[in-house]
Amino acid sequence: MAKCQAVFLLVGALCVLSLAGVANAAENHFKVQGMVYCDTCRIQFMTRISTIMEGATVKLECRNITAGTQTFKAEAVTDKVGQYSIPVNGDFEDDICEIELVKSPNSECSEVSHDVYAKQSAKVSLTSNNGEASDIRSANALGFMRKEPLKECPEVLKELDLYDVKAN
């Protein structure tokens, strides 16, 4: 009889613990990570002479797809290796979430391109309903541009077989 009661008690405890896990699963917690660099050749991608940026400010903003209203906003500053991390609570399945550059710590490398073709933000998916198992979301690297390209840029572009591209 005592064994039977112990088994029922153990089964009941397991049921309660499993329900607690289901209750916690309803709230999503994500971490958005990314990197900021100085685009030393003004070509909108990293090269071997690009530099990481400590102290750069980025913002994460989510907007509802249909209404266009802002549903989430947070800022972060890059660390000594140029990386940032933004904690996010909630699920934003019906939103477009983007990381944008806000402020550069380097006045010589502080321009954000506004050309139509330029990558001005990095999109991230902040929902658990997309097949991604991890709660860490990695954003593409974003770069501030130098006011003038470095003198080594033509050589670097040639190494990449980009002969017709000119650092602007």
UniProtKB/Swiss-Prot annotation:
Domain of life according to the entry: Eukaryota
One Pfam family here: Pollen_Ole_e_1
The keyword Membrane appears for this protein: no
GO cellular component assignments: extracellular space
Keyword Lipid metabolism: no
PROSITE patterns recorded: OLEEI
InterPro entries associated with the record: Allergen_Ole_e_I_CS, Pollen_Ole_e1_allergen
Keywords: Allergen, Disulfide bond, Glycoprotein, Secreted, Signal
Compartment list: Secreted
Signal sequence, start to end: 1-25
Cysteines engaged in disulfide bonds, as pairs: C38-C109, C41-C153, C62-C97
Glycosylated sites: N64
UniProt similarity note: Belongs to the Ole e I family.
The protein, known as: Pollen allergen Che a 1
Organism: Chenopodium album
